[in-house]
């Protein structure tokens, strides 16, 4: 074997060809904007969407790859990473549809916005499969820095600037905390950076039990908890969600959060397997706090964006039930819930964006009487919100059932009961919005709705944002009907990923003892 063949076999770059498609798409957008100029606005977003969908198709063809390890072990292209990378790519494609009209109305460069968003997507996708410390940190910062830039993209809006500054300061602090935990792992393992090598070295040294390892665990969890908006590392979420451009908020609530959970699974399961009881205990506490605070504080919100911000904190708590279960059913239900959360949450944000573009407000009280002026928007928003609340037979109901059942089977009875109670509480603030939209008395109609312009929902007259809303509605509805195939997909991604099978076996043995 010659040198070039040896290098090619070691790098195995074909594993990341979905990301390669996105890199080419990013270059086309930047060069197209440079050459064509402002007239490129009409086709650049669709190039981005086409590239993202092509990346999802490429991910499909890498399923069950017999050689998933790439770049000398720095990246794992296993089925677990494929599912998370697909979630992130699909969330970005939906967000691009939402962004076109929003960015144009703000008078800022659409090409630059798309370039930053695709960079964040690349960071999230690389983070989902990263299995080496340097790769993890570079991917994490690639995602984080792009998110900071998108948050402050509307530079003429003081709220956007404030949100970006808060996000930057708190995000930089969390990155430093996470990096300190990672540096402890590097030192404890004697200079290893591969996650599997670190796990092996930690096992050889004192059986993995040491004060330094416990400190590293706490710092790493703090960094991950910031990314998934878990209480008490959630302080940035309401202010950043309220002040940021709404399409950016939609991406942060799904794409960024999915990347955070992918990192949590791979890092905690691989490196901290010997202290799995400890990190599960910490995540049980985080889940309880997130579900209670997120859903209770959401009851008092008057802004749709702040309500959805606290809702996303509560939703993160539900997802953590699957993570703490540590079983095949737990991981599968976690992935399944993120798959349907993608559709219902992005659908809700798309409706909020359209209403804000038409009325200039996101206050909940201003939605009063919307059904009389825009029945289809009311229907779409109602279905997405009720699905988030877990109302049967919508997709969110099946997602929560799977999560709660996995937690119950794992013996997490108190956690499941808290989840059930807070889920019931969340239904109130979702139904409150729905009830407000369908009031029939003209005197109860808000001023914003009274002046609501006529919207064309015909097939030929819909704008990209309206297409995104309809697609989200269809996807949310189909996710409820086709919950079994989606759950089978999630289960297959777990049962064919070696690190999760080893972790599930270890968890079963420890509980049996």
Curated annotation (Swiss-Prot):
GO BP annotations, alphabetical order: ATP synthesis coupled electron transport; photosynthesis, light reaction
GO cellular component terms, A-Z: plasma membrane-derived thylakoid membrane
Membrane topology type: Multi-pass membrane protein
Membrane-spanning intervals of the chain: 15-35, 43-63, 80-100, 110-130, 133-153, 168-188, 211-231, 245-265, 281-301, 307-327, 335-355, 379-399, 401-421, 467-487
Catalyzed reactions per annotation: a plastoquinone + NADH + (n+1) H(+)(in) = a plastoquinol + NAD(+) + n H(+)(out); a plastoquinone + NADPH + (n+1) H(+)(in) = a plastoquinol + NADP(+) + n H(+)(out)
Superkingdom of this protein's organism: Bacteria
Subcellular localization(s) per the UniProt record: Cellular thylakoid membrane
The protein's enzyme class: translocase
InterPro entries recorded: NADH-Q_OxRdtase_suN/2, ND/Mrp_TM, Ndh2_N
Name of a matching Pfam family: Proton_antipo_M
EC number in record: 7.1.1.-
Primary localisation category: membrane
Keyword Transmembrane: yes
Gene Ontology molecular function: NADH dehydrogenase (ubiquinone) activity; quinone binding
Keywords for this protein: Membrane, NAD, NADP, Plastoquinone, Quinone, Thylakoid, Translocase, Transmembrane, Transmembrane helix, Transport
Function noted in UniProt: NDH-1 shuttles electrons from an unknown electron donor, via FMN and iron-sulfur (Fe-S) centers, to quinones in the respiratory and/or the photosynthetic chain. The immediate electron acceptor for the enzyme in this species is believed to be plastoquinone. Couples the redox reaction to proton translocation, and thus conserves the redox energy in a proton gradient. Cyanobacterial NDH-1 also plays a role in inorganic carbon-concentration.
Similarity comment: family membership: Belongs to the complex I subunit 2 family.
Subunit relationships: NDH-1 can be composed of about 15 different subunits; different subcomplexes with different compositions have been identified which probably have different functions.
Full protein name: NAD(P)H-quinone oxidoreductase subunit 2
Biological source species: Microcystis aeruginosa (strain NIES-843 / IAM M-2473)
């Amino acid at each position: 074997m010659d040198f070039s063949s040896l290098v090619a076999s070691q790098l195995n770059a074909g594993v990341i060809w979905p990301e390669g498609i996105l890199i080419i798409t990013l270059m086309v957008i930047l060069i197209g904007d440079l050459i064509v100029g402002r007239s490129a606005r009409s086709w650049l977003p669709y190039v981005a969407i086409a590239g993202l969908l092509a990346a999802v198709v490429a991910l499909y063809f890498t399923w069950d790859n017999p050689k998933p390890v790439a770049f000398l072990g720095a990246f794992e292209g296993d089925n677990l990473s494929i599912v998370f990378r697909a979630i992130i790519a699909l969330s970005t494609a939906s967000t691009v549809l939402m962004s076109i009209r929003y960015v144009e109305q703000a008078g800022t460069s659409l090409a630059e916005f798309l370039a930053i968003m695709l960079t964040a997507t690349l960071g999230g996708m690389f983070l989902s499969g990263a299995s080496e410390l340097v790769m993890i940190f570079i991917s994490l910062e690639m995602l984080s820095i792009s998110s900071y830039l998108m948050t402050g993209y509307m530079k003429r809006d003081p709220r956007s600037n404030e949100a970006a500054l808060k996000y930057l300061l708190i995000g930089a602090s969390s990155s430093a905390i996470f990096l300190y935990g990672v540096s402890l792992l590097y030192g404890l393992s004697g200079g290893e950076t591969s996650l599997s090598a670190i796990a092996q070295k930690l096992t050889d040294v004192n059986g993995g039990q040491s004060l330094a390892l416990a400190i590293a665990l706490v710092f790493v969890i703090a960094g991950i908890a910031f990314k998934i908006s878990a209480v008490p590392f959630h302080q940035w979420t309401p202010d950043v969600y309220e002040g940021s451009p709404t399409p950016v908020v939609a991406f942060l609530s799904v794409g960024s959060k999915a990347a955070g959970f992918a990192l949590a699974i791979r890092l905690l399961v691989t490196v901290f397997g010997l202290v799995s009881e400890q990190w599960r205990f910490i995540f049980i506490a985080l889940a309880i706090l997130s579900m209670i605070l997120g859903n209770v504080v959401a009851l008092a919100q008057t802004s749709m964006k702040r309500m959805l911000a606290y809702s996303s904190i509560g939703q993160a708590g539900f997802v953590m039930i699957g993570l703490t279960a540590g079983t095949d059913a737990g991981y599968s239900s976690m992935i399944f819930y993120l798959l349907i959360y993608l559709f219902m949450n992005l659908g809700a944000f798309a409706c909020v964006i359209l209403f804000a573009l038409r009325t200039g407000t996101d206050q909940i009280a201003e939605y009063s009487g919307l059904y009389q002026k825009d029945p289809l928007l009311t229907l779409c928003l109602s279905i997405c919100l009720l699905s988030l609340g877990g109302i049967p037979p919508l997709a969110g109901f099946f997602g929560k059932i799977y999560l709660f059942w996995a937690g119950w089977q794992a013996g997490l009875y108190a956690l499941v009961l808290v989840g059930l109670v807070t889920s019931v509480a969340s239904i109130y603030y979702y139904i409150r919005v729905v009830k407000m939209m369908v009031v029939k008395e003209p005197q109860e109609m808000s001023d914003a709705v009274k002046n609501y312009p006529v919207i064309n929902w015909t097939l030929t007259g819909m704008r990209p944002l309206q297409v995104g809303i309809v697609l989200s509605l269809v996807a949310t509805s189909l996710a409820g009907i086709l919950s079994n195939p989606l759950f089978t997909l999630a289960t297959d991604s777990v049962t064919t990923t070696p690190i999760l099978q080893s972790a599930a076996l270890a968890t079963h043995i420890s509980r049996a003892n």
